[in-house]
A protein has these predicted regions:
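Helix-to-loop junction immediately C-terminal to a conserved catalytic motif
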Residues: 58
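Hydrophobic anchor residue at the start of the ABC signature
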Residues: 144
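Conserved ABC ATPase "signature" region
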Residues: 97, 101, 108-126, 178
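Conserved ABC ATPase signature
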Residues: 130-134, 138
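Short coil-to-helix segment of the ABC ATPase nucleotide-binding domain corresponding to the Q-loop/switch region
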Residues: 90-97
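The feature captures the beta-strand-to-loop junction immediately N-terminal to the Walker
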Residues: 43-45
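A short, proline-enriched helix->beta-strand linker immediately N-terminal to the Walker B motif
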Residues: 149-153
Length: 248
């Protein structure tokens, strides 16, 4: 019997905004569970409320209908956006340390954690580098390390590789998978890419056009570890077609 007491539960979550043109319903009756250490991808058309859903999970927005229940009070959440949002006047090391500096953590302990994460994301030779000298992929590695330094209960990623070229994006997907397998966090990632979601996720939620509802909750049955070769398997093609058909 699977213990579901540690699940994050979204109970009939809805979100309505009031703007100048009237009432805008973004999310409608989103009902699902997110399991511990699960890698969940959220797919859907542009403007379908994927980012709003992520903001609700992060505690940055309160749903206007329904509720989100966490297994712990005040969960720690790490956030990574499409823009790395690095501080240009801080080095790679100092950007990663920023969340702990703001909390006034013990510096020696913080430095030890940061060094571990720098090794994890493969930036050992760039600890003193400035953000404007980094490639897009390297900047996102720093952003992921910064999000992990507080040892969050959940990592939320909003199209983290959306601004990268196709080849770098593929490499970063494989890197993210390696990091997730090393740290085993609960991950929720918004993406527009069907193949990216199938390479990374345990499960994919497909949202409809606004107001967004879940139109498909797909368990990704592909064996792990998955590499680029997985794209060419018959199972991958079948799942890809199911996702494509579900996205309106």
């Amino acid at each position: 019997v699977v213990d579901q007491s540690a699940d994050i539960i979204l109970e009939h979550v809805g979100m309505t905004f009031n703007d100048q043109s009237g009432i805008l319903e973004t999310l409608k009756d989103i009902h699902t569970r997110i399991h511990p250490e699960e890698f969940l991808c959220v797919l859907g058309p542009s403007g379908s409320g994927k980012t709003t859903l992520l903001r609700i999970l992060a505690g940055l927005e309160q749903p206007t209908q329904g509720s989100v229940r966490f297994p712990v009070e005040n969960p720690h959440v790490g956030l990574v956006f499409q823009a790395s949002n690095l501080m240009p006047w801080r080095s790679v090391m100092d950007n990663i340390l920023l969340p702990l500096d703001l909390r006034g953590n013990n510096h020696a302990e913080a430095l030890h954690k940061a060094n571990e994460l720098i090794e994890l994301v493969g930036l050992e030779e760039f600890t003193g580098a400035w953000p404007d000298t980094l490639s897009g992929g390297m900047a996102q590695r720093v952003a992921i390390a910064r999000a992990l330094i507080q040892d969050p209960d959940m990592l939320l990623l909003d199209e983290p590789f959306g601004a990268l070229d196709a080849l770098t994006r593929e490499k970063m997907g494989i890197e993210l998978l390696r990091i997730w397998q090393a740290r085993r966090k609960t991950v929720v990632m918004v993406t527009h890419s069907i193949s990216e979601s199938l390479l990374l996720a345990d499960r994919v939620l497909v949202l409809s056009q606004r107001p967004a509802e879940i139109v498909l909750d797909l368990h990704v049955s592909l064996e792990r570890p998955r590499g680029e070769a997985a794209r060419y398997s018959r199972d991958f093609q079948v799942l890809s077609r199911r996702l494509r058909d579900a996205i309106q």
